[in-house]
């Protein structure tokens, strides 16, 4: 059976993008961004705190890290919950030891399930981000916008009592969006989102409710991707992050354009006892280059980038 | 199954004859080089809302697959110029495997490549429009349109072809040869160019395009560590360089800016190029230059050698 002729028609073939979400531009061609105190590299660390329900339905698709075994998949349920009980405290200790700050992207349901965890997260004073309801509630193409709106509002309402400042940013579970997610995030009063991994600096993102900023949070450099999906050694994870840091520092100095390293960390991955020292080696490297690195909350980084001029 | 409706799939594509590596006439590259090195950056466009194809899903997640789309878009927004910087440093010109729609979406990227005297060859229209399910007339239209776009926007004749997303039909190579192409990158059976059979009987050549050293295959499919990828490139070079003392070999490094140009990966590629380009006897070529040289100097000898091998077989 042959394809219809419209398979060779291209209604969105035009200059720029084939959608209207953002303008086309290349990183190297943009006006330079500069960070406070003349630092070369903005360092955004994000720690994702996630709840993977045992009765995963996989509506839309199953987010990575989900249940894979026949019900009840105690193996994956407990390995994920480990991050919220044990792993997070190793990660927080490592941050504290290196005088680093991170943002905390937290599934809303965790605030209902584990208020004791949220009180401890609150005590860090770190910026908190919405991270969806749980890891079995992905925002996928075709999701009913009424349900999606409810998930977003419920998530933000649940986290609000524990956030030091009003929540401005969002990371969708599995970085997945429906056709309406950007509009719904804007309508919920959020300023920025981290889902699109197509850039290394913040950029302007259009919604029907007004402009959102996109703060790309690297997928290919995150622990779950490198250690979990690619099965690379923990030591190799550290090498890769260190190589990225060194490259971006060099590129920033060479071009006199500020760069950003955005690193997502999962306590259920790097919080394991055999992995935490490799995360600490990464933090040691950041500390060794502290004269050139500006470690800040993502909303501060976004403000500084905006301050440099209109975003791409 | 990509056989036209009603046809029985073939057990052998019939595109090349068996030709053992130990019995071939010597290939002499320009300047007596041992290895013809060519770098093939894929400059691709993946669509936000591609039409469905019953034989292959363009994106794994329900549309919009924001993660898949953004992962590829990174190459165009961030990656190309990092890769170009490394290639400039070592005097390497790219042979661009081009989603022809990129000429229209992102002419700024094309200008950067054209200014460096890079070659452009066809990789279809979009990397989310597959050959699967196309009639022969439709596939011909797609191939010819991609070649016409390349000529219109760059002034170059499109000499090479790599089917979009490596999606093929039984007629792909035939159609490209008939449309005026000189070489295909779609066959991975050799480390030297080889003649390829096409139904028109044109002088047509397969130029090695290594899938094993393709960054997307190594990083995405084989999940290789960045530093190991750099080492794999060096190891492949060492062997092809050694063998190239006796007869010229081809080394291709196919790249995708959305893979190789990540901050944790670009250094491994740079190290490998630094190592390779520190050797004398490396012909920094393009796909077109390799194909033309081979057609002019080695093709006829190759046909004779292949025929002689066939005669070894009992009748």
Regions found by a protein language model. Give the residues of each.
Chain A
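Catalytic alpha-helical scaffold of carbohydrate-active enzymes acting on polysaccharides/glycoconjugates
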Residues: 2-213, 239-263, 269-312
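A conserved mid-domain beta-alpha-beta active-site/ligand-binding segment of alpha/beta enzyme cores
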Residues: 216-249
């Amino acid at each position: 059976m042959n394809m219809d002729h419209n398979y060779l028609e291209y209604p969105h073939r035009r200059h720029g993008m084939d959608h209207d979400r953002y303008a086309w531009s290349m990183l190297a061609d943009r006006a330079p961004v500069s960070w406070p105190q003349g630092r070369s590299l903005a360092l955004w660390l994000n720690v994702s705190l996630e709840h993977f329900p045992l009765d995963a339905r996989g509506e839309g698709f199953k987010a990575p890290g989900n249940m894979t075994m026949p019900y009840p998949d105690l193996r994956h349920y407990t390995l994920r919950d480990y991050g919220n009980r044990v792993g997070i405290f190793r990660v927080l200790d490592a941050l504290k030891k290196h005088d680093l700050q991170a943002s905390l992207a937290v599934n809303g349901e965790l605030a209902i399930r584990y208020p004791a965890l949220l009180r401890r997260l609150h005590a860090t004073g770190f910026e908190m981000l919405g991270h969806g309801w749980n890891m079995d509630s992905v925002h996928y193409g075709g999701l009913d916008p009424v349900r999606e709106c409810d998930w977003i509002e419920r998530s933000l309402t649940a986290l609000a009592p524990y956030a030091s400042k009003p929540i401005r940013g969002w990371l969708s579970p599995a970085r997945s969006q429906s056709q309406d997610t950007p509009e719904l995030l804007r309508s919920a009063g959020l300023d920025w989102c981290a889902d699109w991994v197509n850039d290394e600096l913040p950029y302007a993102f259009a919604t029907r409710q007004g402009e959102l900023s996109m703060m790309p949070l690297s997928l290919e450099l995150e622990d779950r991707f490198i250690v979990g999906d690619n099965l690379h050694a923990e030591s190799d994870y550290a090498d890769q992050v260190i190589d990225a840091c060194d490259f971006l520092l060099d590129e920033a100095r060479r071009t006199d354009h500020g760069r950003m390293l955005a690193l997502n960390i999962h306590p259920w991955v790097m919080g394991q006892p055999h992995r935490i020292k490799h995360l600490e080696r990464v933090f040691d490297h950041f500390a060794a280059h502290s004269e050139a690195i500006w470690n800040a909350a993502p909303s501060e980084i976004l403000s500084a980038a905006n301050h440099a001029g209109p975003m791409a | 199954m990509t056989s036209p409706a009603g046809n029985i799939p073939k057990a052998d594509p019939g595109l090349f004859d068996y030709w053992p590596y130990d019995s071939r006439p010597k290939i002499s590259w320009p300047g007596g080089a041992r290895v013809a090195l060519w770098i093939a950056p894929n400059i691709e466009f993946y669509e936000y809302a591609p039409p469905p194809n019953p034989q292959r899903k363009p994106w794994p997640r329900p549309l919009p697959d924001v993660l898949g789309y953004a992962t590829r878009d990174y190459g165009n927004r961030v990656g190309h110029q990092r890769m170009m910087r490394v290639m400039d440093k070592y005097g390497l010109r790219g042979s661009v495997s081009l989603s022809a729609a990129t000429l229209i979406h992102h002419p700024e990227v094309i200008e950067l490549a054209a200014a460096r005297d890079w070659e452009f060859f066809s990789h279809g229209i979009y990397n989310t429009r597959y050959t699967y399910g196309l009639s022969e007339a439709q596939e011909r239209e797609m191939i010819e349109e991609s070649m016409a776009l390349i000529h219109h926007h760059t002034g170059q004749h499109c000499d090479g072809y790599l089917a979009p997303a490596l999606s093929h039909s039984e007629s792909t190579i035939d159609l490209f040869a008939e449309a005026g192409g000189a070489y295909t990158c779609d066959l991975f059976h050799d480390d030297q160019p080889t003649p390829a059979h096409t139904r028109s009987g044109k002088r047509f050549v397969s130029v090695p395009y290594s899938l094993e050293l393709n960054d997307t295959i190594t990083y995405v499919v084989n999940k290789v560590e960045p530093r190991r990828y750099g080492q794999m490139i060096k190891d492949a070079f060492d062997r092809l360089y050694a063998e190239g003392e006796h007869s010229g070999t081809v080394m291709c490094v196919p790249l995708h800016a959305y893979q190789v140009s990540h901050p944790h990966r670009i250094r491994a590629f740079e190290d490998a190029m630094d190592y390779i380009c520190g050797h004398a006897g490396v012909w920094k070529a393009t796909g077109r230059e390799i194909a033309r040289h081979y057609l002019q100097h080695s093709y006829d000898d190759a046909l004779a050698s292949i025929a002689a091998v066939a005669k070894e077989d009992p009748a």
